Amino acid sequence: MKTTSSLTTIQKKIRLCQKCDLCITRKNAVPGKGNHNADVVFIGEAPGKNEDLYGEPFIGNAGKKLNDALENAGLTRSSVYITNIIKCRPPKNRIPNDIEKMMCSDYLEDELTIVNPKIICLLGNTSYYSILGGKEITKN
């Protein structure tokens, strides 16, 4: 059975994390958020400026686009789980490096294990390559 306390524990660990140098430059680590029993999980690259300020995923410009996409698909933020490959904003919004992705990989794995979604939507190149390693999703 999925428990809120398990995700709450992971979220606390993320907020206190000091595994890499991003903890020096961040304002807030940004754990995933949403329905702990979601059938659909969205995984982005990393927090942006607004996410870093408020500690919540996808609340800036990308969040507005995601909200529109969710609405068009008949979904709501409360029905899905939203997270990122890395949990802290890289300086100047640069692409996360391999060390940063590796340091956050256990957090993401734990989130996915607890939520156990039926569908995982990868948002952008970083999440695609981090999860699938560049493998083709479908063949024509």
Please provide the spans of the model-predicted regions.
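Solvent-exposed, flexible loop/coil residues
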Residues: I24-R26, K33-N35, A62, S79, ...
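Short, conserved active-site loops that position catalytic residues or coordinate cofactors/metal ions
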Residues: E45, N84-I85
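The first long alpha-helix at the start of the GST-like C-terminal all-alpha domain
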Residues: N61-V80
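Glycine/proline-rich loop-helix segments at beta-alpha junctions forming the active-site rim
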Residues: R77-S78, I85-N140
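Active-site and ligand/interface coordination hotspots across diverse enzymes
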Residues: M1-N61, E71-N72
